[in-house]
Design a protein with these regions (language model features):
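Noncatalytic nucleic-acid binding interfaces
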Residues: 463
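Catalytic metal- and UDP-sugar-binding loop of GT-A-like glycosyltransferases, i.e.
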Residues: 8, 113, 421, 466
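Conserved N-terminal catalytic core of the sugar/cofactor nucleotidyltransferase
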Residues: 1-7, 14-25, 30-114, 118-124, ...
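Short coil/turn connectors at secondary-structure junctions
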Residues: 1-4, 52-54, 77-78, 105-108, ...
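Residue-level signal for inorganic ion chemistry
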Residues: 38, 97, 116, 158, ...
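Acidic/histidine-enriched, glycine/proline-rich intrinsically disordered or flexible terminal extensions
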Residues: 476-486
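Left-handed beta-helix
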Residues: 1, 206-420, 425-444, 451, ...
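Conserved core of the sugar-phosphate nucleotidyltransferase
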Residues: 121-247, 264, 274
Length: 486
């Protein structure tokens, strides 16, 4: 029995601003421990017994491709990274994964996992995965419902029906329910047959494709067309951009799962019947970490219920989350607050209002401010740069190029650049000349001059770049060669 882990990494996590941003969302962040949420998701399946485990498959937006590839490399977990040219929700993403997994006539069991969830009890998770694999192997579509701990209004619910198989705890899916109001959620908790919708699924690749053919043939056709026009590109699998842009947007639940629940009474010998939908209860410390209050709930706390990370001082505080990326945070006599510091933004919010952080991000976008979408520190396939200072006609950046990293051969129409090597060795191409710079050496790149920066060494290259000119935007780059295919 071959299980193909499929990690869906398309979310933006705007409610965890300012740490999570559009160009560097929460699944890429190490919010709990040293691993990012994506790395923790991949690591969660390690050691599942009774099956063969395929290398991970990640479906993601093109903007995240290099960071995800690097995070998998650091784990020693090379896998397939399927790139969506544009976001089309989870049903098309899973359909692309099923098509990728079906290459060479394979038909593995897909273990579908959002990249940005937390599961504390990995052993409990692996136990239900083994149960789900046995049912999925027989043709069922399996989802895992979280045993509710409170009348939560922020999650959708699954109502479980009749028992499906023994000794498994699996039950037929009776129906899917949208996020309820508080009174309805309280009644669900008392009734006992309702589970939180986790977004975790298992099914054979062929079963999912057949279900899409029955429920959303338009999505299946668009994905098949995009897949047929695709190509391998280093670590990545690209699909046809225009074909995928024509694909309708829909979620796994709306496209297939709700229809499966509605036809639960259809006879199995009816050739038009959809696969059986099954839900298995999961109690494993699950959270979708959808907002700051949810993160506070899963992080270790002191005796006063506080979470403090980074340079933080708390005096007479209760139930407060304080996270610092650099500068000192000092809180005195506060309760139920979220305080988050980054290089370019500070958030202060009451824990009861963390769902409204998204409104701040929306306001930043309307005002055209970059803080809503990008961090001051920006990651590139060759390393990173940090915007240290900026003013009229100048900008200062701290550039770090990883060992072996090579920037594109490029030129700028509107700016000149001064480069100062802080540590490491730089290989410089400037016009027709190539030379090396060491620590405390510098060079000047005139406006309009073709240039390239490389790190030929085995340690990171750190530089200070001072840009000057009439326009300093990142779109003033004309690339002539690029080893990363940008």
């Amino acid at each position: 029995m071959l299980i193909q882990p499929v990690v869906l990494s398309g979310g933006s996590g705007t409610r965890l601003w300012p740490l999570s941003r559009e160009k560097y969302p929460k699944q890429l962040l190490p919010l709990i421990g040293a691993d990012s949420l994506l790395q923790a998701t991949v690591r969660r399946v390690e050691g599942i017994t009774g099956c063969e485990l395929a290398p991970p498959m990640v479906v993601c937006n093109e903007d995240y491709r290099f960071v995800i590839a690097e995070q998998l490399r650091l784990m020693g977990k090379p896998g397939t990274i399927v790139l969506e040219p544009t976001g089309r929700n989870t049903a098309p993403a899973l359909t692309l994964a099923a098509l990728a997994a079906s290459r060479n006539a394979a038909d593995p069991i897909l273990l579908v996992m959002p990249a940005d969830h937390v599961i504390v009890d990995v052993a409990a998770f692996q136990s239900v995965v083994r149960q789900g694999a046995a049912l999925a192997e027989g043709g069922a579509v399996v989802t895992f419902g979280i045993t509710p701990e409170a009348p939560e209004t922020g999650y959708g619910y699954i109502q479980s029906g009749a028992a499906y198989a023994t000794p498994s705890a699996a039950r037929l899916i009776a129906r899917f329910v949208e996020k309820p109001d508080l009174a309805t959620a309280q009644s669900y908790l008392q009734e006992g047959s309702y589970l939180w919708n986790s977004g975790l699924f298992m099914m054979r690749a062929s079963v999912w494709l057949a279900a899409m053919a029955a429920c959303r043939p338009d999505i299946l056709k668009a994905c098949q067309d995009a897949w047929a026009l695709g190509s391998a590109d280093g670590d990545f699998v690209r699909v046809g951009k225009d074909a995928f842009a024509a694909c309708p947007s829909d979620s796994i639940d709306y496209a297939v799962m709700e229809r499966i629940a509605k036809q639960a009474g259809t006879k199995a010998d009816d050739v038009s019947a959809l696969p059986t939908g099954v839900v298995i209860p999961l109690t494993a410390g699950w959270s979708d970490v959808g907002a700051w209050d949810a993160l506070w709930q899963v992080l270790p706390k002191d005796s006063n219920g506080n979470v403090a990370q980074g340079d933080v001082l708390l005096q007479d505080c209760r139930d407060t989350l304080a996270l610092s990326e650099g500068r000192l945070i000092a809180c005195v006599g506060v309760s139920d607050l979220v305080v988050v510091e980054t290089a370019d933004a500070i958030l202060v919010a009451h824990k009861d209002k963390t769902q409204d952080v998204k409104k701040i991000v929306d306001s930043l976008k309307r005002e055209g401010r970059s803080e809503g979408s990008v961090h001051r520190k920006v990651y590139r396939p060759w390393g990173s740069y940090d915007g240290v200072d900026a003013g009229e006609r100048f900008q200062v950046k701290r550039i770090v190029v990883k060992a072996g990293g090579i920037l594109s051969l490029q030129m700028h129409h509107h700016r000149a650049e001064h480069w100062i090597v802080v540590s490491g060795t730089a290989k410089i191409t400037r016009g027709e000349e190539t030379f090396l710079l060491s620590e405390n050496e510098s060079t000047f790149i005139p406006l309009g001059t073709t240039h390239r920066l490389e790190n030929p060494g085995r340690v990171p290259l750190e530089m200070i770049e001072v840009q000057s000119g009439s326009y300093l935007g990142e779109d003033d780059i004309v690339r002539f060669e690029d080893v990363y295919g940008r």
